[in-house]
Amino acid sequence: MSEKTFLVEIGTEELPPKALRSLAESFAANFTAELDAAGLAHGVVSWFAAPRRLALKVANLAASQPDREVEKRGPAVSAAFDAEGNPSKAAEGWARGCGITVDQAERLVTDKGEWLMYRAHVKGESAQALLPNMVSTALSKLPIPKLMRWGASDVQFVRPVHTVTLLLDDEVLPATILGIQSDRVIRGHRFMGEPEFTIDHADQYPQILLERGKVIADYNARKAKIQQDAEAAAAKIGGNADLSDSLLEEVTSLVEWPVVLTAKFEEKFLAVPAEALVYTMKGDQKYFPVYGTDGKLLPNFIFVANIESKDPRQIISGNEKVVRPRLADAEFFFNTDRKKRLEDHLPRLETVLFQQQLGTLRDKTDRIQALSGWIASQIGADVNHATRAGLLSKCDLMTNMVFEFTDTQGVMGMHYARHDGESEDVAVALNEQYMPRFAGDALPSSLVACAVAIADKMDTLAGIFGIGQHPKGDKDPFALRRAALGVLRIIVEKNLPLDLQTLTEEAVRLYGSKLTNAKVVDDVVDFMLGRFRAWYQDEGYSVDTIQAVLANRPTRPADFDARMKAVSHFRTLDEAVALAAANKRVSNILAKATEPLNDEVHASVLKEDPEIRLALQVAVMRDKLQPLFAEGRYQEALVELAQLREPVDEFFEKVMVNADDAQVRINRLTLLSKLRALFLQVADISLLQ
C-alpha cells in the first residue's frame, strides 16, 4: 500500500499568543485520535504554529483504510421464521440493518443451535474521502473558551479564517472547512517575502514558507532561535538575559520572523527597585531584562522584532522611547511613596473591603498580626518581628507603585520597610508572605516569613469557609486551593510543628462572631486534607497509600508526610501483602463482633500455642514501638511490625477465633484488636491493595 504525506494549514488572523501552543498541540492530538479511530496507518504527526496559522503534517499516511471482514449474527432461525416459513419482523429488521433481504442471509450452525448470519468483505475508504471530515472534527474539539464570528457567516473559530490548505502529496482535497474552500494557496509574512503563493506538494512544507514567505512555522525552532539569539546578544554586552519560559513562549507566539535586538535605558532608573523595572519590561512591553555577572540589573533590555529592518537602529530607538515613560513612572512612584512610612497607610486600609461579610483590609491586617504572633510562638520564630510584619503586611497595597504595578505587591513592601528602618526579618517577610505563589514556587526563607505567609492564607481560608463560600467545581475566586496547598507545603517542607486543627481554631477565633458556618473548623481541616490527597497523587503516591493514611485523619502535616513515606516504604517489604490482607481480615472480624471486648488480653485464657506466641509478640511490640510512635518514626515502626507476619499467619491457620467458649472468643477478639491498634498507630494498612 502506497504511503503519502498529508498537510493541513489553517490561515487566520492573529491568534491569542498565550493559547497558541495549546491550540496546536490539541489540534495534533485530536487529529491523531481521528486517524487512529479510522484505522488509517500513519507516521509522525508534526504540528506547526505561528501567529497567523495552525498546521499539521502527517508522514507515511496510508492511502486508504485496510479492508475488513464484517460479521453480524442475527436472530435464531427458530425465531426468524413463523410456522409457515415467513420471516419474522425481527429477522426483517435485522436484515434491513445489514442491507440485505432475509433470504440472502447465511446460516450459522453451532452445537447450541442455528442462527442467521451476515458476512461481508468491506473495502476500506480512501484517505481522500476521510481526511476533510477528520480535520473539521479535530478543529471543533480545540480548547477555545470564546469563539468568534466574522462577516455574514455563522462559522465560529478562535479568530477569523482566511485560507485552508489541504494537500495529500500534490493533490488538493476539495472541502469547505470553517467556511473556506480548500486550496493550495498559503500566505507569507505581512511585510516580508511573498504575501501569497501556491504550494505544489505537502512535502514542501514548512521549507517553502520559510524561503518564500519569510515565516518560521516550526514553533519550537522559532523559540530556540529566539533563545539562542537573545543569549548571544546578552553575552555581547557582558550580561545574561532573563529568559523566563512563560515570556519566551509568549514572544515566540507573537512573531513569525524573529529578529533579536538590544536596547538600553538611562542608568538613573536603576535606583528604582529592579522588580518594578522588570515588571514594566516583561509584563507591559514583553522585553527580556539583562543582568550582569554580579546578578544586578543592567540598563539594557532585549526585545524581538517581527521584521528584518534596513535600519534596526530606528526600531531600537522606537522601543527605547516606548519604555522610557513607563520607567519614569516607576521612578516617580518610588520617590513619592518613600515620603511616607509604611505604617502611615494603615488608616487607608479601612477604606478597602476584603470581603463584605468579613470586613476591611484593616480588619484582615489585625487578624494576620495576631495569628502571625501565635504561629511564631508555636514554631520558635521571633514573635515581635512576626507581629510587626503582620501589621505592615498589606500597607504596600496603598502605595502608588503597587496600585500601578500590581504584581509588585510584597516586594515593594520589602523595599519600603528597609527604607523605613524596619528589621530585615520584617522586610523579607513582607515580600515572602505570598509564597508559594504557584506550584513549584520557592517557600518563605525565614521562620518569621513562614508565620506571616501561613497566617495570611489561613485567615482567608477560615473567613471564606466561615461564610459558606467554599470552592465549587472549577470556581475558586479566592484561590483557596492554592492557599491550602501553600500552607501544607510550608509546614511539611519546613518541618514545622503545627497542627491543622489548632491552627484553624485559632484563625476562626480571631473572627469573633463574624462567621456563620458552625462547622467551619472541620470544613477547613477536611478541605486541607483533601489538598493533601491531590498533592501526594501528583507526587506519584498510590491512591490506596493516601487513603490508608487519611483513615487516621492526622492533622499535623509534618506527621502526615512521615506516615506517607512510612507506608510507601512498607509496601516494598516482602511481608506487606500478607500483613495488609491480615489487617483486612482482622478489620472484618472485629466489625462483625457484637460483644464488648476486654481492656487487655488475659494470658490465663489463652489456650493454643499460636495465640500465646502472637499475644507475647504483640505485647513486646507495644512496649518497643511506643517511643517510635511518640517520635514519629513510623517507617522504623512498620519495619518492626513486619516481623509479625509469621505469628499472624500461624494464628489464622491454627486458631479458631470465634470459639464456642465466650470467654476464649472475647479474649481472641481482644488480641486481634490490640494487633490492629498497633498498625493503626501509623495507618489503616487494611486499605492497601
Curated annotation (Swiss-Prot):
InterPro entries listed in its UniProt record: DALR_anticod-bd, Gly-tRNA-synth_bsu, Gly-tRNA-synth_heterodimer
* EC numbers for this chain: 6.1.1.14
Quaternary structure and interacting proteins, as annotated: Tetramer of two alpha and two beta subunits.
Q: Name one GO cellular component term.
A: cytosol
Coiled-coil parts of chain? none
Q: Into which family does the record put it?
A: Belongs to the class-II aminoacyl-tRNA synthetase family.
Q: Which UniProt keywords apply?
A: Aminoacyl-tRNA synthetase, ATP-binding, Cytoplasm, Ligase, Nucleotide-binding, Protein biosynthesis
A single GO BP term for this record reads: arginyl-tRNA aminoacylation
**Pfam families registered for this protein in UniProt:** DALR_1 (PF05746), tRNA_synt_2f (PF02092)
UniProt GO molecular function: arginine-tRNA ligase activity; ATP binding; glycine-tRNA ligase activity
Organism listed in the record = Cronobacter sakazakii (strain ATCC BAA-894)
- Transit peptide: present as a keyword of the record? no
Name of the featured protein: Glycine--tRNA ligase beta subunit
**NCBIfam families linked:** glyS
Q: Where in the cell is it found?
A: Cytoplasm
Q: Which reaction does it catalyse?
A: tRNA(Gly) + glycine + ATP = glycyl-tRNA(Gly) + AMP + diphosphate
Q: Does the keyword Transcription regulation apply?
A: no
> Which SUPFAM superfamilies does this chain map to?
HD-domain/PDEase-like (SSF109604)
